[in-house]
Amino acid sequence: MSSSRNTHWCHRCQRAVRLHGQEPVCFYCGGGFVEELDMAQASPFDMFRSHRGVVERDQTFDLMDAFSVFMRNRLAERSHDREIRGRTISSGPENFPGLAPLLIFGGQVPYRLTGDNAVEALFNGGSPGIGITRGNTGDYFFGPGLEELFEQLSAGTTRRGPPPAPRSAIDALPTIKIAQRHLRSSDSNCPVCKDEFELGSEAKQMPCNHIYHSDCIVPWLVQHNSCPVCRQELPSASGPSSSQNRTTPTRNYRSSSSSSSSNSRENGNERRNPFSSFWPFRSSGSSSSSTQNRGGTRNSDTSDENHNYHQQQHQQSYMGYSGWPFDY
């Protein structure tokens, strides 16, 4: 009953084997705990088999045979429950009928499948013939929905969360001096930069009684109308002047911030703005205005753009924040 094809499964060797002579004995271990395989379908790797002796036979084929038989049985069981979708290739002498599933290693299939090539393809959907399933198009995200997603992601002007704090609300924040009671409480550190307050130094106090360094809380309030700790919003300013003040900041904040930053440099205790990495791009107002200018004059000189860029960088240097796009 010897054959070049593995006809039984040895439970001791845990692989597909051939019988040793006429007895139901494993060819490799000599054990009798073998089970006949369903050979209704040919092994997909018969085309790669060597006609040389058993000693020279590559054991990779044994693993591939066992895997092929296992998956073929699993697919046969599933076919009773539901219809397996896949491309059906007509059976013929040249199509190797019933070759499923098929395991293909990276690169061209050599005479002996050796090396560390990774698995490239697996299964052909249980359909007769050699083939590889295409991916289900329903599993991919494309079409109008994808375009809408890109539009939402590219909408840099879309805001999330509280709006920016009004200028009047930022101006109305009281400035306090750090006393011993502050250092003995949980307010001894600035929640933004985590630096400890110095006795007698100044700090800004929010309506929720949380205190911050002035150069730590002002950049936050320019973007968010709330406390970074408890999220309590600042009172909104009444009147149309608040929105105008937000879009056209005065030079008082720039001069005061510039002086405070220069003093901190002289003392050698300059604090790095923790929010500078959040705004690596230009402000929405400047980007929208530059977009309109480019739309009106597409062929303008690059020197004008460079001049505007350097002017903007000069304005940002008032606060000493790298990447900070506002005039505060």
UniProtKB/Swiss-Prot annotation:
Q: Which residues are annotated as modified residue N-acetylserine in the UniProt record?
A: S2
Zinc fingers (RING-type), as residue ranges, are 190-231
Q: Where is the composition biased (Low complexity)?
A: 251-266, 275-290
**Keywords, A to Z?**
Acetylation, Metal-binding, Transferase, Ubl conjugation pathway, Zinc, Zinc-finger
Pathway annotation from the record: Protein modification; protein ubiquitination
Sorted alphabetically, which CDD domains does this protein's record hold?
A: RING-H2_RNF126-like (cd16667)
The record's annotation in SUPFAM superfamilies points to: RING/U-box (SSF57850)
Q: Which GO terms describe its molecular function?
A: ubiquitin protein ligase activity; zinc ion binding
EC number(s) reported in the record? 2.3.2.27
Cell division keyword on record: no
Q: Name one GO biological process term.
A: ubiquitin-dependent protein catabolic process
Q: Does the keyword Transferase apply?
A: yes
> Where is it found, in Gene Ontology cellular component terms?
nucleus; plant-type cell wall
Q: Which Pfam families match?
A: zf-RING_2, Zn_ribbon_19
Q: Where is the composition biased (Polar residues)?
A: 238-250, 291-300
Query: Which reaction equation describes what this protein catalyses?
Result: S-ubiquitinyl-[E2 ubiquitin-conjugating enzyme]-L-cysteine + [acceptor protein]-L-lysine = [E2 ubiquitin-conjugating enzyme]-L-cysteine + N(6)-ubiquitinyl-[acceptor protein]-L-lysine
Q: Which InterPro entries match?
A: RNF126-like_zinc-ribbon, Znf_RING, Znf_RING/FYVE/PHD
Annotated region described as Disordered, given as residue ranges = 233-324
For this protein, the record's Gene3D superfamilies field holds: Zinc/RING finger domain, C3HC4 (zinc finger)
The record's function comment reads:
Probable E3 ubiquitin-protein ligase that may possess E3 ubiquitin ligase activity in vitro.
Q: What is this protein called?
A: Probable E3 ubiquitin-protein ligase RHC1A
Q: Which gene encodes it?
A: RHC1A
